[in-house]
Amino acid sequence: MRACLPTPPHARPVHGAFVQAATRGPPHSRRAPPIPPPYTSHRPPPGLSRPRLHPHRASSQIRSTPSASSSALPLSGHPAAMAATSDASPSPPKLHTRLRLWEFPDRYVFEPVDGLADLFLSVSRTNGSMSLVQELPPRGPSTNPKVRIVFGVIGVLRLAVGPYCLVITDRDCVGSYMGHAVFRVTGLKALPCHTASSAEQKKTENEFSELLDAAERSIGLYFSYETNLTLTLQRLYDLGDKFKALPLWRQAEPRFLWNGYLLEPLIENKLDQYLLPVIQGNFQNIHAEVRSEKVNITMIARRCTRRIGTRCWRRGADPEGYAANFVESEQIMQSKGFTASYVQVRGSMPFLWEQIVDLTYKPSFDVLRVEEAARVLERHFHDLQKKYGAVVAIDLVNSRGAEGRLYERYAKSIEPILSEDIRFIHFDFHKICGHIHFERLSQLYDQIEDYLKKHKYFLLNDEGKKIEGQTGTVRTNCIDCLDRTNVTQSMVGRKILESQLQRLGVFGADDTISNYPAFDADYKVLWANHGDAISTQYSGTPALKGDFVRYGKRTTQGILNDLCNALARYYLNNFADGTKQDAMDLIQGHYVSSVSRDIAVPGKPGALESFRVAFALVLGAAMFMMISLRQARNDLRHLVVALMWAGLCIGITLYVKKNGRRFCNRPRFFLSRN
């Protein structure tokens, strides 16, 4: 593991730049303080100095009230949340950063080796029960335990066969966030905490092994032992010191807490020092020098877990209004002692629709329960308003064809709620920009420029005082919310960053990022990597059109890469994503009541194996048909045989085409209307 260096002094934020947590319930209304007008000069305001960092450190361990589920986490500003911290110290308890795992025959024992505690965590290998013990069990020749180092406990996954304890076996430091080290999970291990004694239990355990393997391969997981990555700077700033004294898991935004369900057993046992909040998304830092001024940019992607899933098995929104592939992207800029951030979101079109794979390259779109579309969409936008303020929804799909039907449904459903605070803009990306003229996105910017200026961004001065806040966000979508969406979001982020740097005097009045080639190149790579990470988690491949984001233009290599990635997406969507979807749903607890022997066992060969058999039969029939045609030159009877083989080949092909969905890798815990 490479060393993680602290953020340099010039890049560290001011005290107070921290956020508010939110749950599914409505937050308490709060009147925003008056926002002073922007500075008219291109010089920063007087009184600039290096920001002062006040890292939070715990003097003693704090025990939290157990919670039965992640949805019960306290709401920021909620009386329960404030009362819970009335007697708390002004900083959260420290989390264990390094543990020695002892694997005894009857239990796992986690020994902290970071000097934070003398007690060990003991987890039963029979039933998963947890307790704190003062010493290791006695060791002998017959009980020689296996020992390894782990870097945290993700949580406990409860399956029908028994519980599994998920631990971090490897990590990689990827940078720092507000002066605190941030790590990416590079190794996960599921430790069985049950005994499969009967043949039936062993069979069930083997059937779950594929899902556990998929869970261990989860990508894009990030965490920090000292600060909560689930919260935006603006929300965190509004919390207050009492709320910040809560353990990190209680500060977390449940929508973005990837391991919220897994943490429940640890919460019930009040194991605060082991409760490590994890997000799925992306985290990056870049550092640049512009006109002798240091500029530091941080990009964070937070994937919502409410309707988490894969590209073709999670589309649209659920009846509660939670959209698929909903990702919050926060761009943070630090320069001259100032800290600024801008948040924008992406998410699938928020009504009920699906696109079930059926071996075709582009499966058909089906809008479900049309009569409920307006209600579901209203719920979604009402939730966005509570969390982000005003919303401008940018729809990038085609205006004609299959995508056009979705656009028409979206436009018709959102029309009743359009107002000054909810705007809708349709921008046919492919028609206007084509495959190479992405500079025409300036036409879209012209339509939202006034909105961006009106709703501003979050800005702190060098003393940690809030100069202004972001009062609205941009919600962008295409069909997948990946390729076209990332190109558009990078344009919005670029325009916001330029206005911030101009305001602080780092840029001149007419300066743009493209005027500084080194900075421009780094910034393009930042957004390209951001889009690739989100795309890989949802579709299994990097984003298409990534060469424009990365280099500012379309390239031959980029077009070839898009072709390869498109083919890879086809394979993964049809033959791999069903199992991946099951693993995601199990980790999030979405089907906790359904994980039983009845549905866990498909009892039939996998889709890929069935397709291979059909494909082999088609190839075999085609080969014998060719052989018979050659022999028909000498004996016409072979022509009849060739026609028989041709008929078999065509028959199998037509059967596979008609029943394509049966040959695809489908989730076992998901039943569509078909």
Question: Model-flagged regions — what are they?
Answer:
Residues 1-81:
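Low-complexity proline/serine/threonine-rich segments in eukaryotic and viral proteins
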Residues 9, 27, 31, 37-38, ...:
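Enrichment for repetitive, rod-forming helical segments
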